[in-house]
């Protein structure tokens, strides 16, 4: 990958001039001037996904200039580098190959002179065999009973992805009950353990190194809880499996290393649901549905790696995001799924985007003088409408939004879905076009009221509109379409990182807090006053000690 400061490109300078021309143009004007706007600014993927980006403050010229920026920063070369196994994560000297995990074509992908696909397929086959034994009831616990509950113990990418997917695919789930524990707060594991039976529970310990503080603390607490009933440590092997590469530590914990599922250093945590970390997904929805998830992602990988930029959905969404982030000064993006099963989707890509592109140092090691990754947030519709949409509609901050919905629901209850989708369609229309003062006054007249007498209220009922949105309409949320949707966002994030000249696949920003926590932990072991930190941290620690006494 080339290390190019985007602000020094001619395309960036052209975009700055173009922004000056576009900043006062409204979405309403853009639609009024082009009856074919929807056709020009929307695209479908495999007849399963419609992406409508017409309600944005963009023209064909805008997109052309943004695509020039992608060319000048050598996006095409970066895509080729990632898919070919080049070590584009240079700060950790690693390839970035989550795409290999879902490479259903099985074409060779070479890292350090070795095709990784045989190992990928071997782990998949091992996961298939193990999961079938658990799901069928063939696998027995220490008292001879079949497994009924699965507890995934992980954090970050070892939790957020599997939890999001198992929730999104609940309509496909089998009889096993899934639980997820991540927080080192003892409340999390304690509340889950209240719900399960040690005789029929399988724990998955998801930690590549088997040393992650939060995960191993929870794993040892789960083991202690289990042994209070089971007694003999040999029974641990029937109720614990590991998603790890540290065979020595896994064996010492009491887990049979035959039930250790490996993944590789070219799998980043927040891109790991496609790997052995996805074992909880397989146990929830079955191996065939997991393969469909992989296949959907692979289809999007193929689209991303082969489709020209002007029709490439991840690239288009990435470029539009840069337009708002770097030229309009928008600091956040909202992800708003109109599907309750997708309630963890925004949280998943909060990590996916903010841990990837939340960087202030460029690939040359220099501090940037431009904006990098945005703040990502969101909640399912229609709940968000009764919470934070007020600010999106009438606040002073621009919040570009992605609205996501399925045309077909898994729960066709009465007219619920029509009401849900009526809100989905209405919100993007309202955000784009607003409501003028004239319309508000006419509404009063239609009600037989004199607008002049209500002059004090009229300004508060005016909506400026001109608030940008993308609409992503899925035919139905299936394992395949969900896989494609996740990969769409992954590649959007990568595209933005390439153009913004940052390393998307490391996360050094999480390390300092860990180091300081390891230093502070021993200081909490006694009641002595602390003076080794700044006055604020000392004061907080000492008050904690006083109150716990």
Curated annotation (Swiss-Prot):
Q: Drop me one GO molecular function for this one.
A: monosaccharide binding
Annotated active site residues, numbered on this chain, are: 355 (proton donor), 386, 514
Q: Which reaction does it catalyse?
A: alpha-D-glucose 6-phosphate = beta-D-fructose 6-phosphate
Keywords noted in UniProt: Cytoplasm, Gluconeogenesis, Glycolysis, Isomerase
Phenotype reported upon loss of the gene: Increases acid tolerance in rpoS mutants, defective in glucose metabolism.
Q: Which SUPFAM superfamilies match?
A: SIS domain
Q: Give the UniProt subcellular location, in the record's own words.
A: Cytoplasm
Q: In which pathway does it act?
A: Carbohydrate biosynthesis; gluconeogenesis; Carbohydrate degradation; glycolysis; D-glyceraldehyde 3-phosphate and glycerone phosphate from D-glucose: step 2/4
- EC number from the UniProt entry: 5.3.1.9
Domain of life the protein comes from: Bacteria
Gene Ontology CC annotation, any one: cytosol
Task: Please give the chief subcellular localization of this protein.
Answer: cytoplasm
Instruction: Kindly list the biological process annotations in GO that this record carries.
Output: gluconeogenesis; glucose 6-phosphate metabolic process; glycolytic process
Which InterPro entries does the UniProt record give?
A: G6P_Isomerase (IPR001672), G6P_Isomerase_C (IPR023096), Phosphoglucose_isomerase_CS (IPR018189), SIS_dom_sf (IPR046348), SIS_PGI_1 (IPR035476), SIS_PGI_2 (IPR035482)
**Membrane as UniProt keyword:** no
Top enzyme category:
isomerase
Family listed: Belongs to the GPI family.
Q: What's the stated role of this polypeptide?
A: Catalyzes the reversible isomerization of glucose-6-phosphate to fructose-6-phosphate.
Instruction: Spell out the protein name for this chain.
Output: Glucose-6-phosphate isomerase
């Amino acid at each position: 990958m080339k290390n190019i400061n985007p602000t020094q490109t001619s395309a960036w300078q052209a975009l700055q001039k173009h922004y000056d021309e576009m900043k006062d143009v409204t979405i309403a004007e853009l639609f009024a001037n082009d009856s074919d706007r929807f056709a020009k600014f929307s695209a479908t993927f495999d007849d399963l996904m419609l992406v409508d980006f017409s309600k944005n403050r963009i023209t064909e010229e805008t997109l052309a200039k943004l695509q020039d920026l992608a060319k000048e920063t050598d996006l095409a070369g970066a895509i080729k580098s990632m898919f070919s196994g080049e070590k584009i994560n240079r700060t950790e000297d690693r390839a970035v190959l989550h795409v290999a995990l879902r490479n259903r074509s099985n074409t060779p992908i070479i890292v350090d002179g070795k095709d990784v696909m045989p190992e990928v397929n071997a782990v998949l086959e091992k996961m298939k065999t193990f999961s079938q034994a658990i799901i069928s009831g063939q696998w027995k616990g220490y008292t001879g009973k079949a497994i009924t509950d699965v507890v995934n113990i992980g954090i970050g990418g070892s939790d957020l992805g599997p939890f999001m997917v198992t929730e999104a695919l609940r309509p496909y789930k089998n009889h096993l009950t899934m639980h997820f524990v991540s927080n080192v707060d003892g409340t999390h594991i304690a509340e889950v353990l209240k719900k399960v039976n040690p005789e029929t529970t399988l724990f998955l310990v998801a930690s590549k190194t088997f040393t992650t503080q939060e995960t191993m603390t929870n794993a040892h607490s789960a083991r202690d809880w289990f042994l209070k009933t089971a007694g003999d440590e040999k029974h641990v092997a029937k109720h614990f499996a590991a998603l790890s590469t540290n065979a020595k530590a896994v064996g010492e914990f009491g887990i049979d290393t035959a039930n250790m599922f490996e993944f590789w250093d070219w799998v980043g945590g927040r891109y790991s649901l496609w790997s052995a970390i996805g074992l909880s997904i397989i146990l929830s929805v079955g191996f065939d549905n997991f393969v469909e998830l992989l296949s959907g992602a692979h289809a999007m990988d193929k689209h991303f790696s082969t489709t020209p930029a002007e029709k490439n959905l991840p690239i288009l969404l990435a470029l539009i995001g840069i337009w708002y982030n770097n030229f309009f000064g928008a600091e956040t993006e909202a992800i708003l799924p109109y599907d309750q099963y997708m309630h963890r989707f925004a949280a998943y890509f909060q990590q996916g985007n903010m841990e990837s592109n939340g960087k202030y140092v460029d690939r040359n090691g220099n501090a940037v003088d431009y904006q990098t990754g945005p703040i990502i947030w969101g909640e399912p519709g229609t709940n968000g409408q009764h919470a934070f949409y007020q600010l999106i509609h009438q606040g002073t901050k621009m919040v570009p939004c992605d609205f996501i919905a399925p045309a077909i629901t898994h729960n066709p209850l009465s007219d619920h879905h029509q009401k849900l989708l009526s809100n989905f369609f209405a919100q993007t229309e309202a955000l784009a076009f607003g409501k003028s003062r004239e319309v508000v006054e006419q509404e009063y007249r239609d009600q037989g009221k004199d607008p002049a007498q209500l002059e004090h209220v009229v300004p508060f009922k005016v909506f400026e509109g001109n608030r940008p949105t993308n609409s992503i309409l899925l035919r139905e949320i299936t394992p395949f379409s969900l896989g494609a949707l996740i990969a769409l966002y992954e590649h959007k994030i990568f595209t933005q990182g390439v153009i913004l000249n940052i390393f998307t696949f490391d996360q050094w920003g999480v390390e300092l807090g860990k180091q300081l926590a390891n230093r502070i932990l021993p200081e909490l072991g006694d009641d002595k006053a602390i003076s080794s930190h700044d006055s604020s941290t000392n004061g907080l620690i000492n008050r904690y000690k006083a109150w716990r006494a």
